[in-house]
Amino acid sequence: MKIDVVREMMAQRGFEEYKIRPEYMVGVNRETNDYIYIKIFPGKFELNTVREFLARQFYPIIDPDEKIVTKKTFKHIVQLVIISKTFQNSHFKEFREISRRIQLIRSDFFNINITTKAPRHERVPKDYIKNRFEIPIIKETDPNCIFYNFVKDDVIRVTRSDGDICYRLVK
């Protein structure tokens, strides 16, 4: 895993570096005063360790759509990214049920910055396209969707290097 690629991901999601430590990163969006918290687990993913981390650092999550609040500083976390070497499908499902704001990413995902190899992807308002269910889809597991944290029903504008623009619906 290249830590610079993680920092680039945070910047491209619209967050400035706020606090950087070897085991975690915090970024802030100065316009909205929202935060991203990126936790890095160096070894194998241990479910109980992550549960303890969540219980120790954050208030219990009641609504999966609500922001996550830190216990010490009462900061509103809009994206909580957990990076580890491996995950099982059951881990993804469990954390998605806890909160849609928690994202699990394997550390080998950060070997290269996918955005340097692919066309520019950006989220647009859902009402930007009238018949959004008639446009082609892009899967939520696509590397660009993971990198930018696009979720189901987001409408994405893809701008190619030759200037062509197309739209995709995240499924």
From Swiss-Prot:
InterPro entries the UniProt entry points to: RPB5-like_sf
Highest rank taxon of the organism: Viruses
Protein name, as recorded: Uncharacterized protein 092R
Taxonomic source organism: Invertebrate iridescent virus 3
